[in-house]
């Protein structure tokens, strides 16, 4: 019986040892689990932080990309406008010469020499007008048209029953447009 008691004691001791080992392993596991949980929380926090930075950076990149596209579009439009209106400065400088040609051609020729001179001036005038037309310059229609402050500059007002109200009665100086841009408005007399 003593043997049996010793055997039971031995078994109990072994069970206690196993329980202690199991308890030690469990406490180590729970310490590791706590450490793993806190490490997981730190990692999740880091992931969230990096995700926020990524979102912010993506947003900034998209805004920069949109700004760059807008910039390219503006540069292209400016380039097209510069090409379209490249002759504006030259045309503005030539307009006074055209006005002088028109005035000179209104003079009555008294002899053959004068007629020949006027004929030569008229040829030069037509060539200038042709060259300007090729560049997209056109005279602004004024007399009989409704007054348009974008195309006409009113220098006088009159009352004339032959014309509608606010119609251009007389043109003092021709106006010109380059494509769709007014270079010089027509100086006109307007009916009230």
UniProtKB/Swiss-Prot annotation:
It is found in: Cytoplasm. GO terms for biological process: protein folding. Keywords: Chaperone, Cytoplasm, Stress response. Residues 25-34 have a biased composition (Acidic residues). Residues 1-20 have a biased composition (Basic and acidic residues). The keyword Nucleus does not apply. GO terms for cellular component: cytoplasm. InterPro entries: GrpE, GrpE_coiled_coil, GrpE_head. It holds the Pfam family GrpE. Belongs to the GrpE family. Participates actively in the response to hyperosmotic and heat shock by preventing the aggregation of stress-denatured proteins, in association with DnaK and GrpE. It is the nucleotide exchange factor for DnaK and may function as a thermosensor. Unfolded proteins bind initially to DnaJ; upon interaction with the DnaJ-bound protein, DnaK hydrolyzes its bound ATP, resulting in the formation of a stable complex. GrpE releases ADP from DnaK; ATP binding to DnaK triggers the release of the substrate protein, thus completing the reaction cycle. Homodimer. This is Protein GrpE. It comes from Bacillus cereus (strain AH187). The gene is grpE.
């Amino acid at each position: 019986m003593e043997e049996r008691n010793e055997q039971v004691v031995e078994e109990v001791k072994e069970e206690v040892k196993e329980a202690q080992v199991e308890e030690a392993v469990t406490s180590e596991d729970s310490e590791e689990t706590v450490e793993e949980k806190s490490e997981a929380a730190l990692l999740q926090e880091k992931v969230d932080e990096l995700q926020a930075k990524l979102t912010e950076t993506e947003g900034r990149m998209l805004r920069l990309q949109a700004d760059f596209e807008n910039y390219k579009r503006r540069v292209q439009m400016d380039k097209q406008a510069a090409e379209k209106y490249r002759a504006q400065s030259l045309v503005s400088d030539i307009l006074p010469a055209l006005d002088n040609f028109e005035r000179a051609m209104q003079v009555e020729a008294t002899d053959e020499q004068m007629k020949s001179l006027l004929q030569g001036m008229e040829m030069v005038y037509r060539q200038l007008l042709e060259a300007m037309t090729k560049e997209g310059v056109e005279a602004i229609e004024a007399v009989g048209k409704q007054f348009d402050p974008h195309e006409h500059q009113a220098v006088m007002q009159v009352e004339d029953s032959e014309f509608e109200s606010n119609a251009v009665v007389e043109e003092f100086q021709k106006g010109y447009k380059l494509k769709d841009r007014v270079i010089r408005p027509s100086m006109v007399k307007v009916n009230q």
